[in-house]
């Protein structure tokens, strides 16, 4: 097109669409970004569920100890878990990403994995409270019934308590997945090449924001 050429609305619309998606196969950059976004979300959710489950079990087990039978080691780990959830839930995700990428993993160039790790650690703090709430929502009589049948504490938790808690926490875990999916856009600030990163790159080349975003 010549400089200053006047385009109709339809021509302008198609030209901007062509620039953003078809020119130089730019649509492939979006596909790559979507793949990275889903990968980061899956890794972060897996880490968050594992970490959150461990933290929740430690805290629930500590809280259910009988008076006079407190375990010092369990008390220490419970305190660590409380500090972890308080700090992670009380600081912005952006700050956590910057600390992980510029301080802890300052020499790493794998920004996608650093982003996934950070999101997973962040998610773990929230998932732990979701799972802890689900475990505490189970009728205490269920634990007493399991123990009266001769099952030890861990067996009762695995066989009786946790299966009931899972049903209660599934909707909240679904919400956490959606939140993680949206939060992946933040890893752009540390160089993670997800969907927003791809869109920004194309926007910087075409000087057009509507279609890339």
Region locations from a protein language model:
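Transmembrane alpha-helices and adjacent helix-loop boundaries
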Residues: 1-213
